[in-house]
Every structure is written in structure tokens, then in C-alpha cells.
């Protein structure tokens, strides 16, 4: 699972996901990519599940690039705890994804293999996505 080695602060505010992604919205490594169409928090487990699905489907050959990284800690309070007494402890990590952001890239395989692998990875994602090809 992906997570930062160390962070400056243990806990973060939730923030909000306004607008579209202006960074990381162009294919820069491979030839095919999976692009987000909705804003969401994508957990490190979901990123890993998508990556595994793609590698398993592409078999040998081909290279995969994961273009998002979970750098936001999500805190969770224990069950049946009264209100107050501070913020919960960090439980898992998420990547904040805005519409237009490239999630995965793929190269070194034919288009139909890439399309199949990326469609399986997209089913692991909690958002609507689209398959794009670099111009």
C-alpha cells in the first residue's frame, strides 16, 4: 500500500474538492491512460487494487505508471465514542482526485490489451473514468 514515509503533520483538515485538475491532466509517460471524470478521495487500497488488476491483465510486457499518490491522512474515531476529546487517529491515506486527473498510464502494449486492462482497473475505482490515448 502506498503512503508517505514521513509527513510534517500527523493530521489534516478535510478540505474541499472544487473545480477541475490543472496539474497531472496530460499523458506524459505512456500511450494510454485512465482519466478521472468526477472528484473523489481515492484510498491507497483502491490505487493498489487498480494497479494489480492492470499488471495481471497486461501479463508480460508493457509498463504501468501510477500518477496519483495518497498523501492525505484520514482520521477515524473509535466506535461508540462520545463527542469531543480531540480528533481521531489517522487510519488510512487518500489521494485527492479532481476531474481531469490522470490516474494510471500504460505503454508497450496494443490498444485492445490496454483498453481491457484499464477497464478492469476502472471498475476498482469509486468514480466514473474514461480511457484516453495520447495524441
Swiss-Prot record:
Location in or out of the cell: Plastid, Chloroplast
Keywords: Chloroplast, Plastid, Ribonucleoprotein, Ribosomal protein
Claim: Chloroplast is one of the keywords in the record: yes
Annotated transmembrane regions: none
Cited CDD domains: Ribosomal_L16_L10e
Family, similarity comment: Belongs to the universal ribosomal protein uL16 family.
Subunit structure: Part of the 50S ribosomal subunit.
Name of this chain's protein: Large ribosomal subunit protein uL16c
Organism expressing this protein natively: Panax ginseng
Lineage of the organism: Eukaryota, Viridiplantae, Streptophyta, Embryophyta, Tracheophyta
Amino acid at each position: 500500500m502506498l503512503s508517505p514515509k514521513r509527513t510534517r503533520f500527523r493530521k489534516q483538515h478535510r478540505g474541499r474538492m472544487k473545480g477541475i485538475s490543472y496539474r497531472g491532466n496530460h499523458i506524459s509517460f505512456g500511450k494510454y491512460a485512465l482519466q478521472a471524470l468526477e472528484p473523489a478521495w481515492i484510498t491507497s487500497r483502491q490505487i493498489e487494487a487498480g494497479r494489480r488488476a492492470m499488471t495481471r491483465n497486461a501479463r508480460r510486457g508493457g509498463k504501468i505508471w501510477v500518477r496519483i499518490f495518497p498523501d492525505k491522512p484520514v482520521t477515524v474515531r473509535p466506535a461508540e465514542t462520545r463527542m469531543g476529546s480531540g480528533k481521531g487517529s489517522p487510519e488510512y491515506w487518500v489521494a485527492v482526485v479532481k476531474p481531469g486527473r490522470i490516474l494510471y498510464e500504460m505503454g508497450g502494449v496494443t490498444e485492445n490489451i490496454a483498453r481491457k486492462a484499464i477497464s478492469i482497473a476502472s471498475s476498482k475505482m469509486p468514480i466514473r473514468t474514461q480511457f484516453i490515448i495520447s495524441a
